[in-house]
A protein has these predicted regions:
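Sec/Tat signal peptide C-region and signal peptidase I cleavage site
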Residues: 17-21
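N-terminal mature ectodomain segment of secretory-pathway/periplasmic proteins
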Residues: 26, 33-123, 151-155, 298
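Divalent-metal (often Zn2+) His-rich catalytic cores of metallo-beta-lactamase-fold enzymes
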Residues: 447-482
């Protein structure tokens, strides 16, 4: 009897799965018929583009820019896409981070199969780390979703808003909704993010219209991490334009750049750790090490941790000072928790990190997710001092920052060294200085804080760029550049 019951249950679930797949096929075929089956598509419009991970405060929206021109061309057969856009800073200036620029910022982004690259000028710039997401974005478009669902044994489930279709492509699960009119109204998936873990990416489609026999939405909104990254009003659609992309040889042969660590001693027991786009500092105390800044990723943090242990052997890393919550400056912080360090950050960041770090990390597990440790925080309100033996390090909340509400700066009174992040980036040889109004605003506030706190600064150690005398900051503030 028990055996017959087990067989009956197995047959029930097998049949239910087959029915779900069959239902999905029927729904997808109806949607393809209603929307029009295409091999490629091009759509253009205007709207807003947001700087992901650069919110002014935890849980605030990503800072927005004006998207004055946007065209995306997708070829589904060759799994290729080209994205051309122009965006500009809004007026008045918005709070938050993001790459500063003056006037119009033009971008050309490509993906073809396993290769991704940008083309800001004549020479392509390989972007191997972007290939997986850009490829996935092809299947998050309405027609791309239908094609990928048909090819990947999708399943169907009835919901109040329509039929939910789900399928697996590689390690990613993609889900979408098809409404009663057979239109794709939403697609969603998750991407790995060093701060947010398995991060929800949700794209909604509305205002469908007929463009030369093909139905396409006139409003597209994509959110990542719960906040909008793209809001597009579509004004032109070209079905089946074709897309002939040839992957440049330099892109085919490109490999991810090796992580470099270039260390400069600033004073006894104080080192500036550079070698990439973001810097850190290693500070020796009599019985422990403090590291300032855990940017980018776990890989970067592991390299800095190894360097800290080389510089100061046989001492534990007790503290990691996180200057602010922007993702490029906090992507490697969790690695220090796994190392056993306490995280010093402005108090407003603590609830944000606690919530973000509790999210699942099935797509990109890191050392902290494997360590089974609880994160310890030392929240800073306005000032906190680390003092042991002859070493004194002062941490201040930078009030009035338009870049980040929880910005911290670090000062060494004996050595007259100031650490700062994103307020001032020294000019580098052969690298154009950032434009726009934001650098001038940020540097003016930094100088105001230094004066208000009566800090006697001789040297500035920035988290981008090179170590410079404080007089460079004063000159930049006087000329309105930063």
């Amino acid at each position: 009897m028990a055996k017959r019951l087990w067989i009956a249950c197995a047959l029930f679930f097998l049949c239910a799965g087959a029915a779900s797949a069959q239902d999905a096929k029927t729904v997808l075929q109806a949607a393809q018929k209603a929307m029009g089956d295409v091999t490629s598509i091009q759509y253009s419009g205007t709207g807003h583009l947001n700087f992901f991970g650069q919110a002014w405060a935890p849980n605030a929206a990503w800072p927005t820019t004006n998207l004055t021109s946007y065209t995306k061309t997708v070829d589904y057969n060759s799994k290729s896409a080209k994205e051309n856009l122009i965006h500009s800073e809004p007026t008045p200036m918005v709070k938050g981070g993001g790459r500063p620029f003056a006037g119009d910022d033009k971008q050309a982004n490509f993906v073809s199969g396993q290769y991704a690259w940008d083309q800001p000028g004549a020479a392509p710039v390989p972007q191997p780390g972007a290939a997986a997401e850009r490829q996935l974005q092809i299947w998050l478009t309405p027609h791309g979703f239908l094609k990928a669902a048909m090819e990947n044994n999708a399943t169907a489930k009835k919901q109040a808003t329509g039929t939910e279709i789900s399928f697996q492509t590689g390690k990613f699960t993609v889900t979408g909704t098809i409404d009663a009119h057979n239109m794709v109204t939403k697609t969603e998936t998750h991407l790995p993010n060093p701060v947010l873990g398995d991060m929800l990416v949700e794209t909604t489609f509305s205002g469908y219209k007929d463009f030369n026999g093909v139905k396409f939405p006139t409003t597209i909104v994509q959110q990542q991490g719960g906040s909008t990254v793209l809001e597009l009003t579509v004004n032109s659609v070209n079905p089946n334009p074709g897309l002939n992309i040839s992957v440049p040889d330099s892109v085919k042969t490109a490999t991810p750049p090796a992580i470099k660590v270039d260390t400069k001693k600033l004073a006894d027991g104080i080192w500036f750790v550079a070698g990439g786009s973001h810097n850190s500092m290693v500070v020796e105390f009599p019985t422990y090490i403090t590291v300032i800044e855990g940017p980018l990723s776990e890989a970067r943090s592991l390299a800095v941790i190894a360097e800290a242990k080389r510089l100061v052997p046989n001492k534990p890393i007790k503290y990691l000072i996180n200057t602010h919550s922007h993702f490029d400056h906090s992507g490697g912080v969790r690695t220090y928790v796994a190392e056993g360090a306490t995280i010093i950050t402005q108090e407003m960041n603590v609830p944000f990190y606690q919530k973000a770090w509790a999210a699942p990390r099935t797509l990109g597990p890191d050392n902290y997710s494997k360590a089974n440790k609880e994160a310890n925080f030392l929240p800073v309100k306005e000032k906190y001092t680390l003092m042991e033996g002859n070493r004194t390090l002062e941490i201040f909340h930078e009030n009035g920052s338009m870049h980040n509400a929880g910005m911290l700066i670090v000062y060494f009174p004996k050595e007259k060294i100031l650490e700062e992040a994103d307020d001032f980036t020294p000019d580098l040889p052969d690298v154009p200085a950032p434009g726009g109004i934001r650098p001038a605003v940020f540097i003016a506030n930094l100088l105001k804080q230094v004066q208000a706190l009566k800090l006697d600064v001789a040297t500035v150690a920035p988290m981008h760029g090179i170590v410079v005398p404080f007089s460079d900051v004063q000159k930049a503030a006087a000329t309105g550049k930063g």
